[in-house]
Amino acid sequence: VDYTLAPDASIPEIVDECRRAVGWLHHQADELGIDPRRIVVSGSSAGAHLAAMVALPGWQQAAGLPADLVRAAVLVSGIYDLAPLVGTSIDIPLNLADSEVESMSPARATLDGFPRSLVCWGEVETTEFKAQSREFANGLTQAGTTCTVLEVPARNHFDVVLDLADPTTDITRRVLSVL
């Protein structure tokens, strides 16, 4: 999804854009030749955060969409709790309010009904990215979601997605198993 970037849009506006994009896919499924019951969201880094926000249950009904809109989520090297960003240079364009940290952090949300997921990260990620990924995956499992975790050996935050171009890698096989 080609969403508006901060500071031109707030995190809630960006999340709304992504949710509307997936809603559009659902509504246009026949025209696009896709099965609206097989929508999978995926993202890396900030994209994983946005994919998790789209996969969160609870917003779909108000948008006139089925509760099970998203069949699965593939989340790579994401940030799921925005609190550590507050006061950092990353927060300058985001300008996160406390209420946004709470409402826009998937790790702080009720995860009951979250679709099956693959949560992965690179072995050479920062401690914070690894911790957030592990904690979010644990939260999903505790909520009853089928969640597969994968630490990709010898990969960092920026090159972990490169393995997705190779059909023989573990991450690609795991992604395909979620589909």
Can you say where each PLM-predicted feature lies in the sequence?
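Alpha/beta-hydrolase superfamily serine-hydrolase fold, recognizing
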Residues: V1-L179
